[in-house]
């Protein structure tokens, strides 16, 4: 009888260990995949605003459809990341720690950066759905917050993600920041060049005088 009890306990412990491994790896993979997709979405968005395009012999992959598709995929993997983090028995995060900033028992500041980024992303998504009602100009101003979301998520991943300790994880962050930073600088330079460019002066045609022959 004792052997049966010991065997049942060992089997239960093995199942819990397996479950913990699955949820932990899913949370890690979901979060990192969401970050990569978000970075690609931001890169495509900045490329569109700076009039960059793939070589003429390649398919036209830099377009609004690709930007929206990457954003949708990133949103899905954010949901996977949040759900797996909540059910993971190792991290032991409650719903309040997942959705309320600065109350987490683990790196509260950097966890808060991810939570704030989540709420900003929701606001940007709602503004996109209401673009016809709020106007294009207002939507453009709100859409710029995507860069803030990207910065907050980068900090969240760097300081809370375990994959930051790997060379490939750190390399992905560095390449991502370099690409986004370079495109952002190009975007600012183009905007400044357009502002400094002299605007054409409208020429008002003068009425022609009619001469009378005497």
Q: Can you describe what each PLM-predicted range is?
A:
Residues 2-214:
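Membrane-embedded alpha-helical bundles that constitute the cytochrome b-like, heme-associated redox core
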């Amino acid at each position: 009888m004792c052997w049966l009890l010991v065997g049942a306990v060992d089997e239960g412990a093995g199942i819990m260990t397996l479950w913990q491994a699955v949820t932990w790896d899913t949370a890690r993979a979901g979060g990192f995949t969401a970050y990569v997709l978000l970075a690609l979405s931001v890169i495509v968005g900045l490329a569109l605003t700076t009039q960059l395009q793939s070589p003429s012999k390649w398919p036209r992959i830099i377009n609004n459809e690709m930007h929206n598709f990457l954003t949708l995929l990133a949103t899905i993997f954010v949901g996977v990341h949040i759900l797996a983090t909540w059910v993971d028995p190792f991290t032991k995060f409650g719903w309040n720690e997942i959705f309320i900033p600065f109350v987490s028992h683990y790196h509260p500041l950097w966890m808060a950066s991810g939570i704030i980024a989540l709420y900003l992303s929701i606001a940007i998504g709602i503004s996109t759905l209401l673009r016809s009602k709020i106007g294009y100009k207002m939507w453009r101003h709100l859409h710029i917050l995507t860069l803030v979301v990207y910065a907050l998520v980068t900090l969240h991943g760097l300081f809370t993600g375990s994959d930051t300790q790997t060379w490939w994880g750190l390399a992905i962050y560095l390449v991502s920041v370099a690409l986004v930073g370079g495109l952002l600088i190009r975007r600012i330079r183009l905007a400044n060049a357009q502002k400094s460019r002299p605007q054409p002066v409208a020429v008002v045609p003068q009425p022609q005088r009619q001469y009378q022959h005497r």
